[in-house]
UniProtKB/Swiss-Prot annotation:
Top-level taxon of origin: Bacteria
Family classification: Belongs to the AIR synthase family.
Listed pathway(s): Purine metabolism; IMP biosynthesis via de novo pathway; 5-amino-1-(5-phospho-D-ribosyl)imidazole from N(2)-formyl-N(1)-(5-phospho-D-ribosyl)glycinamide: step 2/2
Protein keywords: ATP-binding, Cytoplasm, Ligase, Nucleotide-binding, Purine biosynthesis
Protein name: Phosphoribosylformylglycinamidine cyclo-ligase
Cellular component aspect of the GO annotation: cytosol
Gene for this chain: purM
Catalytic activity: 2-formamido-N(1)-(5-O-phospho-beta-D-ribosyl)acetamidine + ATP = 5-amino-1-(5-phospho-beta-D-ribosyl)imidazole + ADP + phosphate + H(+)
EC number: 6.3.3.1
Any Pfam family: AIRS
GO molecular function: ATP binding; phosphoribosylamine-glycine ligase activity; phosphoribosylformylglycinamidine cyclo-ligase activity
Swiss-Prot/TrEMBL GO biological process terms: 'de novo' IMP biosynthetic process; adenine biosynthetic process
Main localization of the protein described in the UniProt heading: cytoplasm
Keyword flag Acetylation: no
Length: 352
């Protein structure tokens, strides 16, 4: 008889009971997000979802994303309640730019050692994000992987599927010189540029947990969840039919994201003086001595979404967005791009 002790999965660092406890805790979160098209609850091998009624030629739109190294800041600050909102926002905001209504969302949560309380906070945030975007949380994967992650550190990924009527896909092909560009404000850096943000904090030696800007803790400003624009934008599309293109301003800022939805030969002229940049961006620029163009190439600088409409629809679009609770403004317009010119020109850049 071998004297070798009997090994279990728990001895190897995987706690099946903890995983099951987490599933029980998050079932109610998923239930709150349920859409009528979703068939069944959590726990099956696959999630089933019907196409909503009323579509003649439905086209499915998919997207996947993470939250970048904002997650490292969340871990350092032990703040896990809103990072799930960020995860959903990064996916659903990408879907809505082509006119798609988000249908369902799945998440992937990988960790070295599963902390049920932390994971439940994260998934509760994911549920909140799904509710804000009218999307169902239909499943996910929680992977406890000892030896792959340090202690209770975790990584997150999200996956979302939406639907749009084929004839109503918004692809930027109708954008023309003279069109107006509208902007919607961000809540802060959203989920991009955090490797630079963390480097600025490190190099400057700033005590972010004891710093306030405009009477608000800096940590709250840096961790403010990414805004979810789905419902106001779907209302704008439905009520006006005027949207020609939309750009979700993520990694790469205005300079890299607006060109993704512009046809060849079009140039966006953006007036940087058209909005007051939130104080958190000025703080980051000052502490990191960051060049002005670099700021706009890495961070959203206060702009979360850009919308293109014809000039005759500007006032209607602004009013619909205001009625939906947004604070839109005209940020620029479309011009014919000069030969060899960049597709985005930033006007009135402040001297650094």
């Amino acid at each position: 008889m071998s004297k070798q002790p009997s090994l279990s999965y728990k001895d190897a660092g995987v706690d099946i009971d903890a995983g099951e406890a987490l599933v029980e805790r998050i079932k109610s979160v998923a239930k709150r997000t349920a859409r009528p098209e979703v068939m069944g609850g959590l726990g099956g091998f696959g999630a089933l979802c019907e196409i909503p009624a009323g579509y003649k030629q439905p086209v499915l739109v998919s997207g996947t994303d993470g939250v970048g190294t904002k997650l490292r800041l969340a871990l350092n600050l032990n703040k896990h309640d809103t990072i799930g909102i960020d995860l959903v926002a990064m996916c659903v905001n990408d879907l809505v730019v082509c006119g798609a209504e988000p249908l369902f969302f799945l998440d992937y949560y990988a960790t070295g050692k599963l902390n049920v309380d932390t994971a439940a906070q994260v998934v509760t945030g994911i549920g909140a994000g799904c509710e804000l975007s009218g999307c169902s949380l239909v499943g996910g994967e929680t992977a406890e992987m000892p030896g792959m992650y340090e202690g209770e550190d975790y990584d997150l990924a999200g996956f979302c599927v939406g639907v749009v009527e084929k004839a109503e896909i918004i692809d930027g092909s109708k954008v023309a010189a003279g069109d107006a560009l509208l902007a919607l404000p961000s809540s802060g850096p959203h989920s991009n540029g955090y490797s630079l943000i963390r480097k600025i904090i490190e190099v400057s030696g700033a005590d972010i947990e004891n710093t306030q800007l405009d009477g608000k803790p800096l940590t709250d400003l840096l961790m403010a969840p990414t805004r979810i624009y789905v419902k106001p934008l779907l209302k704008l599309i439905k009520d006006t039919g005027a949207v020609k293109a939309m750009a979700h301003i993520t990694g790469g800022g205005l300079l890299d994201n607006i060109p993704r939805v512009l046809p060849k030969g079009a140039q966006a002229i953006v007036d940087v003086a058209s909005w007051q940049r939130p104080a958190v961006f000025d703080w980051l620029q000052e502490k990191g001595n960051v060049d002005e163009t670099e700021m706009h190439r890495v961070l959203n600088c206060g702009v979360g979404m850009v919308i293109c409409v014809a000039q005759e629809h500007v006032e209607t679009a602004l009013n619909v967005l205001r009625e939906a609770g947004e604070q839109p403004w005209v940020i620029g317009q479309i011009a014919t791009a000069p030969e060899g010119a960049a597709q985005v020109e930033l006007k009135n850049l402040k001297a650094h």
